[in-house]
């Protein structure tokens, strides 16, 4: 099992998104915890341009620390904006994200389906911070049309998959609570609509367990389309991202199913918004290493 460290580590420590100085600090701390593979993100236009602009320095620091960037995620909600000009601009930014991922030597570039363009009353998912266990209430505009939103999403994901393929990268997407694609079946429907062999899945155990999915069945549904795993635990009631073993995720079932489908990608520790973060990442890494040895995965 190849184990890496999610960018949620940096976000939990330094805010959303971390500044460039804190990006370097996060990488140093990831290396100190024993990780060799890491994620990076570019959140919105300003942060994406900042990370891309500093890519030579970031890559050099990763090399010094013995780190490999296994996944880069440009977070661009405007890929599904109702205004076409905003979607086109977001796609141009995604191209910058692909160039950045390629420069880092990543094999994957990740995207999100984003929150739907509804009016949230109170908390909005992933707006200013990555918070878990929230309750969402929305107002639906009478002019809202689901078919139009789905069309924007499929068109944008198709364009993103093509752009990634041109650079030799795989495109992956994770279903997340509160977003347009929030479960395995929605992702399968999106994959069918996009119809690209280059488009794969991030199996995020924390989000899917909170959606009451039977996780080994989720693995069976996605099969060889799983490119990457985000590993966190919870009690199935909320989408908390606790250390593996701290909730009731069926870890044996998940990894035996992954083994059946010959999964060989990275499993990333995706723990956040918990006390004693460093200790929880160490325990998570040890838990996954022990699981891998016991199940021979």
Where is each model-derived feature located?
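Aromatic- and acidic-residue-enriched segments that line the glycan-binding/catalytic groove
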Residues: 117-136
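A short helix->loop->beta-strand "cap" motif at the edges of active sites that frequently abuts
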Residues: 67, 106, 169, 261-265
């Amino acid at each position: 099992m190849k184990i890496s460290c999610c960018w949620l580590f940096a976000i939990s420590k330094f805010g959303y998104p971390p500044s460039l100085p804190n990006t370097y600090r996060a990488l140093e701390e990831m290396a100190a915890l024993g990780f060799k593979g890491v994620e990076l993100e570019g959140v919105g236009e300003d942060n994406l341009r900042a990370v891309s602009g500093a890519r030579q320095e970031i890559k050099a620091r990763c090399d010094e620390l013995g780190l490999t960037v296994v996944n880069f995620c440009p977070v661009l909600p405007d890929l599904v904006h109702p205004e076409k000009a905003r979607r086109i601009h977001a796609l141009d930014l995604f191209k910058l994200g692909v160039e950045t991922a390629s420069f880092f030597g990543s094999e994957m570039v990740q995207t999100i389906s984003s929150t739907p363009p509804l009016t949230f009353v109170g908390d909005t998912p992933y707006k200013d911070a990555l918070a878990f266990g929230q309750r969402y209430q929305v107002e639906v505009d009478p002019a809202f049309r689901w078919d139009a939103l789905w069309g924007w999403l499929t068109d944008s994901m198709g364009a993103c998959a093509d752009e990634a393929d041109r650079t030799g990268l795989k495109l992956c997407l994770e279903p997340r609570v509160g977003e347009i694609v929030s479960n395995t079946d929605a992702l399968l429907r999106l994959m069918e609509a996009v119809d690209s062999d280059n488009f794969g899945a991030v199996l995020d155990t924390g989000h899917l367990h909170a959606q009451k999915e039977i996780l080994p069945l989720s693995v069976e549904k996605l099969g060889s389309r799983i490119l990457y795993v985000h590993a966190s635990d919870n009690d199935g009631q909320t989408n908390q991202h606790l250390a593996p073993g701290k909730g009731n995720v069926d870890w044996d079932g998940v990894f035996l199913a992954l083994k059946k489908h010959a999964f060989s990608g990275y499993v990333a520790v995706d723990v956040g918004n918990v006390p004693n973060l460093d200790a929880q990442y160490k325990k998570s890494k040890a838990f996954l290493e022990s699981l891998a040895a016991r199940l021979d995965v």
